[in-house]
C-alpha cells in the first residue's frame, strides 16, 4: 500500500466516525502549494463555508501559499465564514494528514477565530 492509499484509508475511517456522530465537519486538504478548508453539513450534502489559498484575498495576504502562515489565514477565514452562517461547533476532519505543521496551524487559527472543536 502506498502513502496516498494509506492516507485515504485513515481519512475514510475518521469520516465514518464523524458521520456516526452526525456532526458538521471542518475538512482540511493540503497540497505542496495550497491549503484548502471547507465546513460541510452533517449529512455531507452542503458546503456551508470554504476558504483556500487559491482565493485572491487570502493569496494577497501571505507571501507563500504553501506554508504555516497561509494555513493560519485560511483557518481564520473559514472560521469567520462559518460563524456568519451560524455554525459554531464542528468536528475536525484532517483528511488522514498528520496533525502537525499546516494542518495544526489551520486548526489552532480556526479555534482562535471562534470555532469550537
Swiss-Prot record:
Instruction: Write out the GO cellular component annotations.
Output: cytosolic large ribosomal subunit
Single annotated GO MF? structural constituent of ribosome
One GO biological process term is: translation
Q: Write the record's keywords in alphabetical order, separated by commas.
A: Ribonucleoprotein, Ribosomal protein, RNA-binding, rRNA-binding
> In its keyword annotation, does this UniProt entry include RNA-binding?
yes
What's the short name of a Pfam family annotated to this entry? Ribosomal_L18p
* PANTHER family the record matches: 39S RIBOSOMAL PROTEIN L18, MITOCHONDRIAL (PTHR12899), LARGE RIBOSOMAL SUBUNIT PROTEIN UL18M (PTHR12899:SF3)
What this protein is reported to do is described as: This is one of the proteins that bind and probably mediate the attachment of the 5S RNA into the large ribosomal subunit, where it forms part of the central protuberance.
The entry sums up its family as follows:
Belongs to the universal ribosomal protein uL18 family.
Task: Quote the NCBIfam families the UniProt record gives.
Answer: L18_bact (TIGR00060)
Quaternary context: Part of the 50S ribosomal subunit; part of the 5S rRNA/L5/L18/L25 subcomplex. Contacts the 5S and 23S rRNAs.
Which protein, by its recorded name, is this?
A: Large ribosomal subunit protein uL18
Q: Which gene encodes it?
A: rplR
Amino acid at each position: 500500500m502506498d502513502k496516498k492509499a494509506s492516507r485515504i484509508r485513515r481519512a475514510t475511517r475518521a469520516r465514518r466516525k464523524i458521520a456516526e456522530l452526525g456532526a458538521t465537519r471542518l475538512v482540511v486538504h493540503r497540497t505542496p502549494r495550497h491549503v484548502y478548508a471547507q465546513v460541510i453539513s452533517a449529512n455531507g450534502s452542503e458546503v456551508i463555508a470554504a476558504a483556500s489559498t487559491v482565493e485572491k484575498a487570502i493569496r494577497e495576504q501571505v507571501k507563500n501559499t504553501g506554508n504555516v502562515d497561509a494555513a493560519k489565514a485560511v483557518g481564520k477565514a473559514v472560521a469567520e465564514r462559518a460563524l456568519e452562517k451560524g455554525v459554531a461547533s464542528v468536528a475536525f476532519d484532517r483528511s488522514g494528514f498528520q496533525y502537525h505543521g499546516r494542518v495544526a496551524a489551520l486548526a489552532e487559527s480556526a479555534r482562535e477565530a471562534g470555532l469550537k472543536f
